[in-house]
Regions:
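Phosphate-coordinating catalytic segments in nucleotide- and nucleic-acid-processing enzymes
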Residues: 1-101, 107, 112, 195-223
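RecA-like P-loop NTPase motor core
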Residues: 58, 136-144, 158-223
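Short amphipathic alpha-helical face segments that pack within enzyme cores
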Residues: 103-106, 156-160
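Loop/turn-to-beta-strand initiation segments
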Residues: 113-116, 145-149
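Walker B catalytic motif
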Residues: 119-122
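H-loop/switch region of ABC-family ATPase nucleotide-binding domains
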Residues: 151-153
């Protein structure tokens, strides 16, 4: 069971610090129309519940979600399935990545243009392909006017943000990057903020900035 909240504001897309209010917000918005620029590409459905399924299904093929109020209580229940012929399962009985992604999708779809959505580690519990698709989704919502503030350690998330710029799906000036390497003597405050060119290239690539995969591949190739 998931709680409702007198403090959470559906207008401000507040799903709670741990996503605990996401099912409640889903129930409130389930049959509301979603703005066209936030809909999954080439998907004709317009309702909130259908768009939640469209985006979840993009990250986790075949996945869908359902939430409903529990009669006589202030709680909601949440279920997932991994295919139309699959049985509905509680979040505890399904992969954690889906449970973690659900509040992110609900928050992004609920947010209005200009509102800020703060996301910590959207790549959590996702394999590389799913991380890449998460990056695509974040870029589209940013392009739709939602201010998406992300803390990430995923090179896949970064790469898809840059690809969105290259594909003209996101303006270069709308992608701000900040790399926190820690303050070191003689190196300022340890924050580097490379700018993004229109082709997705970065103006600067600091040491230790998403470079470990390349370092490892070079080491493998040298032997």
């Amino acid at each position: 069971m998931f709680p409702s909240s007198d403090d959470a504001d559906p207008v401000n897309a507040d799903v709670g610090s741990e996503g605990q209010f996401a099912p409640w917000l889903y129930v409130r918005n389930a049959d509301s129309p979603v703005e066209e620029e936030k809909r999954f590409p080439n998907d004709e459905s317009v309702t909130f519940r259908a768009q939640v399924d469209a985006w979840l299904g993009h990250i986790f093929p075949g996945a869908s979600a359902n939430a409903a109020s529990i009669s006589g209580t202030s709680y909601s229940r949440l279920e997932f399935r991994l295919g139309r012929s699959s049985a509905w399962s509680r979040p505890a009985n399904i992969g954690y990545g889906l449970s973690y992604a659900f509040p992110l999708v609900v928050a992004l779809l609920s947010a209005h243009k200009g509102q800020i959505v703060v996301i910590d580690s959207p790549e959590a519990h996702l394999h590389p392909r799913a991380q890449s698709r998460m990056g695509e989704m974040l870029a589209q919502f940013a392009n739709a006017g939602v201010q998406v503030l992300v803390e990430t350690h995923s090179d896949h998330i970064l790469s898809d943000a840059r690809l969105a710029v290259q594909k003209k799906a996101l303006k270069a000036e709308d992608l701000a990057l900040h790399f926190f390497s820690g303050a070191q003597e003689g190196h300022g405050n340890g924050i580097v903020s490379p700018t993004t060119h229109s082709d997705g290239r970065l103006s600067d690539w600091p040491e230790f900035f998403f470079d470990q995969a390349e370092i490892d591949l070079m080491a493998l190739a040298s032997h």
